[in-house]
């Protein structure tokens, strides 16, 4: 029988409601861990709940669950107010990736792109992002766009990067939009603002930055803290786009 930690309902209302409305014995260890991770994402996770979820994932991993391998890695990678541990995250991602989990391969791409407990290795990052992109992961696809935009591992080609960002929007699904559209619109906004890979167009930049702000706001409000800087950039980008637009407004005497 699973022994669930007791939390303050005022601090963790979603977790409390989930536990009151469900019999946790009806859930597998992986299912229960996934449900608990999705609760109260806007507040730091309680340490006792973090430890409980880790144990649930470890139980599932012992049974060969590759999704638990990846999700435990994500729990260590993300900063939910407990133990952010890139070493453990990479270990879990590698374990899942070797067993064919494409999301883990994408996550490893991030680790090598940013040097999370491994040396920055753009060749490996490109390799893992390519695997994700071939499997339809739009995050992997726009990260490949970033590599062309910056000349990481591949020859710098802003035009190719811009086309990749456009391709992301062309193939965007309703399911992917809440977590992908914001970052892609931000990149398109910057491309239009500075004429990187396309003609400079302040009006198109403003539209993209506005759309980016809406999606990124929802991401941050849903607990995706790492996108707070992107949200700030989208707001700042609007100001820069408006400044350029105002330069072209004729003076009226």
Language-model features: where?
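Short helix-capping/linker turns of helical repeat alpha-solenoids
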Residues: 23-28, 39-42, 63-65, 78-80, ...
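N-terminal alpha-helical interaction modules that lie
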Residues: 2-44
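Helix-turn-helix repeat elements of alpha-solenoid scaffolds
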Residues: 7-9, 44-51, 85-86, 121-122, ...
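TPR/TPR-like alpha-solenoid repeats
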Residues: 35, 75, 111, 132, ...
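Hydrophobic face of amphipathic alpha-helices that form TPR/SEL1-like repeat modules
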Residues: 34-41, 71-78, 82, 107-114, ...
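Terminal, low-structured helical/coil segments at or just beyond the last alpha-helical repeat
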Residues: 218-253
């Amino acid at each position: 029988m699973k022994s669930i930690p007791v939390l303050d309902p005022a601090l963790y209302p979603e977790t409390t409601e989930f536990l009151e409305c469900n019999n946790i014995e009806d859930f597998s260890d992986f299912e229960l861990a996934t449900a608990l991770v999705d609760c109260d994402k806007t507040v730091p996770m309680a340490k006792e709940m973090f430890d409980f979820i880790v144990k649930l994932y470890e139980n599932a991993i012992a049974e060969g669950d590759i999704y638990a391998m990846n999700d435990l890695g994500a729990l260590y990678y993300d900063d939910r107010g407990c133990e952010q541990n890139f070493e453990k995250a990479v270990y879990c991602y590698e374990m899942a990736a070797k067993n064919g989990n494409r999301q883990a391969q994408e996550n490893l791409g991030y680790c090598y792109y940013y040097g999370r407990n491994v040396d920055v290795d753009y060749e490996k990052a490109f390799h893992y992002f390519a695997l994700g992109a071939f499997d339809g992961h739009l995050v992997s696809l726009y990260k490949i766009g970033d590599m062309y935009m910056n000349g990481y591992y591949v020859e710098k080609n802003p035009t190719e990067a811009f086309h990749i960002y456009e391709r992301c929007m062309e193939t965007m699904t309703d399911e992917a939009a809440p977590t992908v559209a914001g970052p892609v619109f931000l990149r398109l906004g910057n491309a239009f603002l500075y004429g990187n890979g396309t003609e400079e167009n302040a009006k198109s930049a403003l539209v993209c930055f506005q759309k980016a702000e809406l999606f990124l706001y929802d991401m941050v409000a849903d607990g995706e803290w790492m996108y707070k800087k992107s949200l700030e950039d989208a707001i700042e980008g609007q100001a820069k786009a408006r400044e350029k637009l105002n330069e072209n407004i004729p003076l009226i005497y």
